[in-house]
Amino acid sequence: MSEDKITGTLAFTVFTAVLGSFQFGYDIGVINAPQEVIISHYRHVLGVPLDDRRATINYDINGTDTPLIVTPAHTTPDAWEEETEGSAHIVTMLWSLSVSSFAVGGMVASFFGGWLGDKLGRIKAMLAANSLSLTGALLMGCSKFGPAHALIIAGRSVSGLYCGLISGLVPMYIGEIAPTTLRGALGTLHQLALVTGILISQIAGLSFILGNQDYWHILLGLSAVPALLQCLLLLFCPESPRYLYLNLEEEVRAKKSLKRLRGTEDITKDINEMRKEKEEASTEQKVSVIQLFTDPNYRQPIVVALMLHLAQQFSGINGIFYYSTSIFQTAGISQPVYATIGVGAINMIFTAVSVLLVEKAGRRTLFLAGMIGMFFCAVFMSLGLVLLDKFTWMSYVSMTAIFLFVSFFEIGPGPIPWFMVAEFFSQGPRPTALALAAFSNWVCNFIIALCFQYIADFLGPYVFFLFAGVVLVFTLFTFFKVPETKGKSFDEIAAEFRKKSGSAPPRKATVQMEFLGSSETV
C-alpha cells in the first residue's frame, strides 16, 4: 500500500531523530578508550607522590597545566607509602564517578521523557533536551583547562540527563511517525544508531586520532557536533501526527503532518487508526506505580519486567563496555584499544542480526539462548584471565569469550526486555510500566558503572565468575517465570500470568491490544 513505504520525508525525519540515539551511544563509549590518559591527567592535577612516576611520565606540561605534586620532604617511608595508597584510592574513586555519573543523570531523567514529550511536543522536547547535550559537551570539552575531575563528572551527569530523556523520546517519536508495517523495523534504528555511536567513539578514541594527551578533551566534547546538527534538522521535521491528534486534538495539523510523512493525500487508514486508538484509550485509565505492585493483575508482569532489565544490566555487559580497554590489557593484549573497537563492531553487527531473528525464534527463546551463551562466555573469560600467567595463549581465549559474550547479549538480552515489557501491558498501565523499567535499567547501569572497578580490583581475574553466577540465576528465573509473547494477544499473556500467580481474572475487562508483535512496541 502507498502509505506503507519509506518516503524521503520519513527517512529524513527518522535519521534526524536517531542522531539523538547516536549521541547516547557516543556518550556511553567515549569514556573508555582514553582511560589511561584521563587518569594520568587526574593524578597530575590532583597531585601525586614523586615516586609514583606512572602518573607524570611523558606528560607534556604546558603553560596552562599547573602541577600540584606533593613532595615527600618530611615524611617517613611508611607514611609515604600510605599517602601513595590514599592517592591511588582517590583517583580510582574519581574515575569510577566519572564513569557512573552518566548513569545518575540518566536515572533521574528517565522518568521525565514521556512527560516532556507530552508537555512540549516531540520536536520541541528533543530540541530542549539538546540544550543538556550541548552543556555536557561544553563542560567536558573545557575539562583540560580546569579541575578536570569536577568538570568531567559534571559534564557526564548533564549528558546523562540528556540521554535519559532521549532514550524515551526517540523511540516514542519514531513509533508514532512510522507506518504500522514498518514500525518495528524503523524502531530498531534507535538501538542501531546507539551502538554505532559507541563504535564511532571508540574509533575516535584511538591514540593517533583524539585519545591522546593533546586532544582527549576534544574527544569528550565532540558530541556537540551531532547535537547541533540535530537541532538544525529538527526545524524541518514534522511533528508527530499521533501527538497532534491524540494529545492536542488538532486534526487538521495531524493530517498535514501525515501527508508529508506518507507522501500521499490518501491518509484515511492512519486517521481511522488514530480515531480508534483515541476511543479505546478513553475507556482505560492510567495506572500508578503503586497500583502496578498492589493490583494482582499487574504485580507478576511488573516483577518479571523488572527482572528482565536486572538480568540485562547485571549480566556484566556494561562492565565490558565501560572497562573493556583495561580488561583486554589484563588479558595481555598488546593493543587493547583495537580489541575494544572489535567489541563495538560486533555489537553493531549482532544488533542488526537480532532484528531478523526476533519474530522467527520468539522473544523468550532468544533471551534464554543469549543468557546461556553469556554464562559460558563469562566462565571462559575468567578462566582465560586466571590461567594467563601459565599459558600466554589464554589471552586469545579471553578475547574470544568477550566477543562472543557481546554477540549473545545483542541477540537476546540486549533488545528483548524492551519488546517484552511493552507486550506485558495494555495501553493504560504501559506508560508507567515502561517508565519504571527504564528507571530500573538506569539504576542498575549506575551500580555497575560505580562498582565494577572495585569488584574487579577485589576479585581480580575471577570477576566474571561472579557475573556467570548472576547470569545463571537469571537464566533459571527466565526459564520458569517468563512467558513467550510472540504472536499472543494480551488476554493470552495476562491469562498465563494469572495462572502462574494463582490470581483470579479481572472482574471487568478493559480494552486491550488485539495482537502483539514487535512492530507494535511503541
Curated annotation (Swiss-Prot):
Membrane topology, from the record: Multi-pass membrane protein
Protein's UniProt name: Solute carrier family 2, facilitated glucose transporter member 2
Cross-referenced Gene3D superfamilies: MFS general substrate transporter like domains (1.20.1250.20)
PANTHER family per record: SOLUTE CARRIER FAMILY 2, SOLUTE CARRIER FAMILY 2, FACILITATED GLUCOSE TRANSPORTER MEMBER 2
Sequence positions that bind D-glucose: Q191, Q312, Q313, N318, N347, E410, W418
NCBIfam families: SP
A GO molecular function held by the record: dehydroascorbic acid transmembrane transporter activity
Coiled-coil spans in chain: none
Tissue note: Present in liver, intestine, kidney and beta-pancreatic islet cells.
Segments on the Extracellular face: 32-96, 147-156, 207-215, 323-337, 387-401, 453-459
Keywords: Cell membrane, Glycoprotein, Membrane, Phosphoprotein, Sugar transport, Transmembrane, Transmembrane helix, Transport
Pfam families per UniProt: Sugar_tr
Family, as annotated: Belongs to the major facilitator superfamily. Sugar transporter (TC 2.A.1.1) family. Glucose transporter subfamily.
Notes on how activity is controlled: D-glucose and maltose competitively inhibit fructose transport. D-glucose, D-fructose and maltose inhibit deoxyglucose transport.
Glycosylated residue positions: N62
Reaction it catalyzes: D-glucose(out) = D-glucose(in); D-fructose(out) = D-fructose(in); L-dehydroascorbate(out) = L-dehydroascorbate(in); D-galactose(in) = D-galactose(out)
Cellular component, GO, one term: brush border
Cytoplasmic side: 1-10, 118-125, 178-185, 237-301, 359-365, 423-431, 481-522
Function comment: Facilitative hexose transporter that mediates the transport of glucose, fructose and galactose. Likely mediates the bidirectional transfer of glucose across the plasma membrane of hepatocytes and is responsible for uptake of glucose by the beta cells; may comprise part of the glucose-sensing mechanism of the beta cell. May also participate with the Na(+)/glucose cotransporter in the transcellular transport of glucose in the small intestine and kidney. Also able to mediate the transport of dehydroascorbate.
The record's account of how the chain is modified after translation: N-glycosylated; required for stability and retention at the cell surface of pancreatic beta cells.
